[in-house]
């Protein structure tokens, strides 16, 4: 029972992360790419920290499943199998969150790059348009001297 509760706790945290990912997905195309990029980076860090905490438990649980039946008897095998199943659910959710955040990061980064390109295009056009009158002014000014 205690071990099952230990694996139930991460689901609450993963649900909070999922809710935040959903919020970021909804806001990603509303023109706040820089803020979204920061939020996605923070969420990626949370998921990475979570993965670092959960991954080492895999070997422990697999060892417990194989050796626990020898020590406690075959009657505990279904419970240990359930624990491994809970672990796999947590790990699969973390993998899903990681992939979603990677895709969101790439998308948001692309949107930010597209906006930057638009600004650079506008500045290039402005520079070209202002170059011609400035050149004529300089040429005319030199001829006056």
Q: Where are each of the predicted segments found?
A:
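Divalent-cation
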Residues: 1
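Membrane-associated alpha-helical segments
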Residues: 6, 14-15, 22-140
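Membrane-interfacial hairpin junctions
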Residues: 142-145
